[in-house]
């Protein structure tokens, strides 16, 4: 099974490995989600529909289905 950003646990750090082909993939790339960039899952909204990530040096909120388009390679766990 391929690791994707929606499967990262809170505080888990990874490198973006690629993007799944799709209409939203170009938008993700424009927002800085490019291979080699560091991504950390920060927290989930109270309703569970949105996940906050730190991508390089900024915060980005994504729906779970959007985060599923980001392929990742986990590198370490960060204790919040």
Positions of the model-derived regions?
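Short alpha-helix capping/helix-loop boundary micro-motifs
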Residues: 1-2, 23-27
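Ubiquitin-like/PB1-type beta-grasp interaction modules and other compact soluble beta-rich domains
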Residues: 2-7, 38, 50
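Conserved hydrophobic positions within beta-strands
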Residues: 16, 39-41
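A structural micro-motif recognizing beta-strand termini
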Residues: 18-22
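C-terminal structural segments of small proteins and small subunits
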Residues: 48, 52-80
């Amino acid at each position: 099974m391929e690791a994707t950003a929606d499967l990262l646990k809170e505080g888990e750090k990874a490198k973006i490995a690629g993007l799944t082909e799709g209409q939203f993939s170009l938008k993700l790339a424009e927002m800085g989600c490019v291979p080699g960039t560091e991504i950390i899952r920060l927290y989930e909204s109270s309703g569970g529909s949105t996940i906050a990530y730190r991508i390089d040096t900024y915060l980005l909120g994504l729906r779970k289905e959007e985060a599923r388009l980001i392929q990742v390679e986990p590198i370490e766990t960060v204790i919040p």
